[in-house]
A protein has these predicted regions:
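A short, Lys/Arg-rich alpha-helix, primarily the initiator
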Residues: 1-29
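DNA major-groove recognition helix of helix-turn-helix
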Residues: 51, 68, 76-79
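DNA major-groove recognition helix of helix-turn-helix/homeodomain DNA-binding modules
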Residues: 59-74
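Interfacial/linker helices and their anchor residues that mediate assembly or domain coupling
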Residues: 83-110
């Protein structure tokens, strides 16, 4: 029997970060990075690290999946391959809100 580590394919960090970015652009638009970070309960700078190549923890990926409706396995592995970003609902990003906190239901925080 082969050791377990030889049977599990390595994660592609760059691909995970790129899929997370694609989801953010699809649901919040190109200027919605801070808004999307707030939806994930992250600071904009922490979220930016994830888009720039630092692998997000599983709880962040899970939150992104729950908030957007993206399959978690798609974020991690790109499966199922028939998943389409176009099926995601857009989240309205209030004008000038790219620095404010927003709750998961899309309402502005206080």
């Amino acid at each position: 029997m082969k050791p377990l580590e030889n049977t599990i394919p390595a994660l592609n960090t760059a691909a995970i970060c790129e899929r997370l970015k694609q989801v953010r652009i699809q649901v919040c638009g190109t200027r919605g990075q801070s808004h999307f970070a707030a939806l994930l309960h992250l600071s904009p700078s922490t979220y930016n690290y994830y888009e720039k190549g630092r692998i997000p923890p599983v709880d962040v990926l899970d939150r992104a999946a729950r908030v957007t409706g993206v399959p978690l396995l798609w974020l991690i592995r790109g499966e199922p391959t028939d998943f389409s970003l176009e099926s995601l609902k857009k989240i309205d990003v209030p004008a000038g809100s790219d620095a404010g906190m927003v709750s998961a239901n899309g309402t502005a925080g206080v």
